[in-house]
Amino acid sequence: CVVGIFPGTGIGGACVYEGQLIIGKNSSCMEIGHLPMMPQGQLCGCGQRGCLETLASRLAISAAAATAAYRGEAPHLLEAAGTDLSNIRSSALADAIKAGDTAIEQVVRHAARWLGRGVAVAVNLMAPDVVVIGGGLVEAMPGFYLDEVEESARSYCMSPYRKTFKVVKAELGDNAVTIGAAALAREAGKK
């Protein structure tokens, strides 16, 4: 079993079991970004409160980073990207961390740890052999970000599972969506 989790504007997910993509009856499944993590948390785009996306998506990270920049806590990010969320991309976050914006490092670390909790839920439910994490955050900060996600996942999943899975970086980059869509279309054509 392989679980894929892709934090970006939202947080998408997928699961492949015995070579088959698991899909729901009426639509996709593995909407991991909408796991309820904080019942009294921020309003999510889905209409619920406290979903994982409100805590760990790149959009949530960018919003917290913009606040830090506005408050003067992230001068490098402020100079490079300002406080406009559309300018605060994964690469700008990585550059700000490299330049010494510790507030941005804390924001990203906090979000990565929340994503790790989501990974732990997936591990507890699916017992995957591999968890693939992809997207711009992983590409911009592969070691730091992935290490935080993995450490958090292992600390929050059930102890029997802690050493049973690998966390790896997605390798398809910008081609992942195209390849995934083609595979899904091929599978749909077989039915």
Kindly label every feature range from the protein language model.
Residues 8-10, 137-138:
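Short glycine-rich anion-binding loops that position phosphate/pyrophosphate groups of nucleotides
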Residues 2-6, 12-14, 43-45:
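Short glycine-aspartate micro-motif
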Residues 1-2, 166:
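Residues that mark the start of a beta-strand
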Residues 21, 36-191:
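ATP-binding/phosphotransfer module of carbohydrate and carboxylate kinases, centering on a glycine-rich
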Residues 17-18:
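A cytosolic small-molecule/anion-sensing beta-strand core signal
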Residues 11-12, 177:
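Short phosphate-engaging motifs
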Residues 28-31:
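Structural signature of FAD isoalloxazine-binding scaffolds in flavoprotein oxidoreductases
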